[in-house]
Every structure is written in structure tokens, then in C-alpha cells.
Amino acid sequence: MAIVSSENRTCADEKLLALYQSWSYIASIVFNCLVPTISTYFLGRAIFQLCNQATIQYSTRILLIATILFAACHQVSYFAFKIDLLHTMFFKLDQPCFLQRSSYDCRFISIAQTTGVVGMALTGLAMSTDRALALTFPADYHKLKSVPRVVLSVFVFIVSFSTWFLLTMNDPLTGYLNHCGFYPSYSVANFQLMLDVILYLAIFNLIWDVILFYYARQQILWRRSYQFQKRYEARISLNCTQAVFVISICQCISNGANSGLMRLLMMIGTSITSVTYSSLLSLFYTAPYSCILLPILMMRISEYIREQRTIGILSLRSEKPGLEEHHQRMRAAWS
């Protein structure tokens, strides 16, 4: 049985001490520290590019930047607890009964980690909601200007930051953990529920994004206009929906995989050793790798949209739709 947390301080067994002294495990922890370090560069570049990207609608850019900030929050907490674990492995192995950390000592890392994970999941839903409002009520959405994005961003921030406090409301934080990467001892069941909710949310968001993308494609035909400005706005709206679609799909897959694998690990934790549990944790916890791929994906999509914008402008300028062609496109849209 894996003892990764306990109500009282417990001494590390010989197998766990051997794991902490293993150079292969030390190398894996060092690699884990490099991942958030490298991701910081890409996260910064992605924010800079989004701030200077005029082809993506402003509300969408705000939510994309919020996603990056939540990813950065997660990476900082992940780096902190890995560094703390390295410190334990190098300097505290001569005190096997004092290797564990209290849930109270780990609270700041746990808060940041939970905020980052929940925030990334909710911003995906917020982006889809923003796109749904923009596609369904374009005139009203334009009049509201910054209201939708402000409301969605504030909602996501409040829920993400308060999640940890709600889950640990009845936890005195007096339990002990092998390291700060584990959930508080008395709140494990609540965090399991959180992982389940994130998994179901990812599945729901995936289905919703597919519907939104199909609807955006159809809108190009439904709202075909002879005016260049309206056709251009329709193209921009579709491009933003494409960006949100691709990013949300990747987020849904990564959030679903991370939540599902972590939930599985917590289920089988009672039948495996602490050494096996610690080894599987580094493999199953995929959120850090998602955080390094997310900004790279955003930058690639931003470049793609910029190219499509140029192609779209050239094609719209050369487009001379006739009345019969307009009717044919409308009939095709409704068929």
C-alpha cells in the first residue's frame, strides 16, 4: 500500500530512501524542474505575441492570455515543489522520520497548483462561451464591448482561486505528505471529486466546441453579404472560432488525460508501493507538459490566422458574388 500522506508523521521505509538515492530518479526530478523553466520562455513569448496580434478579437485574446497566466501559476508551483523535493533528497535523508511535510507547510504550493489546473479548465469553457455569444448575438456582443470578457475573466479567477479553500474547508491541515505534490491528507476525496468534474467538463467542452465550429462555418453562408466589411467580419469571426476550437480541443484532451490518469493513480494507490506510486506520479501527471505545449500551439495558431487573414482579404476583394450565387449559397447552408 502506498503511503503518500498520513494523519501523523511516519518514517520513510528503506525502499523510499533507496528511491530518493537513485540517480535515475534524481535525474527525472531534475528533468521535471527543466520543464517549467523552459515553458516560462514560451509562455512569455505567447503573451507578447497575443498582445500584438490584432487579427484575433480582443475578447478572445484576453481569455487566451488568462489561460497562459493560469498555466504560469501552475508551472511556478510545480517547479517549487520539485525543488523542495530535491532539497529533501540531497540534504535530509539522514533524518528518515522527518522527510514528510505538513499539509499546512505545503498550502501555498497546493493553492497555486489547484488554481492553475482549475483555471486552465475553466478558461477553455469561458472561451467557448465567449465564442457562442459572439456568434449568436453579434450585434449585441459588439455593443457590450468589454463586458462579456470582464465578467467571464472575473468569474474564472474567483472560482479557480476559491476552489482549494472550498475543498479544504473542513481540513485542519495537520496531516503529513511525502512531498508537496500530494493533496492534503483529510481532503483527498474532495480533490478526487475535483478531478472527476474537470474530466466531465473537458468532455462537455469538447462536444460544445465541435458544435460551435460547425455553426461558425455555416454562418459564413447564412450571413453572406455584398458589403466587403460584413464579409470581412464574418471571416475574422470564423478565424477566432477556429483558434478557440483548436486550442480548446487540445486543452480538453490534456485536461481529460491528466484528470483521468491522476484519478486512476489515486484509485490504484491502495494496492501499490510508495516507490511505484512516486514513479507513476511523474508519468501520469501530464499538466506540466501541457503547459509547455499550450503557448507553442497558441503562437502557431496566431501565425496561421495572420496568414489566413491576408489570404481572406485578397479573396474577398476579388470576389464578385451575383444574386443567383448568393441564393445558391443560402440554399446550400439550409440543406
Curated annotation (Swiss-Prot):
Which GO cellular component term is one of those annotated?
membrane
What GO biological process terms are annotated to this protein in UniProt? detection of chemical stimulus involved in sensory perception
Topology: which residues are Cytoplasmic? 44-61, 129-149, 214-235, 300-335
Does the record's keyword annotation contain Nucleotide-binding?
no
Q: Which SUPFAM superfamilies match?
A: Family A G protein-coupled receptor-like
What job does the chain carry out?
Answer: Chemosensory receptor that negatively regulates RAS/MAPK signaling during vulva induction and the negative regulation of olfaction of volitile attractants. Required for the suppression of vulval induction in response to food starvation. Signaling acts through the GPA-5 G-alpha protein subunit.
- UniProt protein name: Serpentine receptor class alpha-13
Q: Which organism is it from?
A: Caenorhabditis briggsae
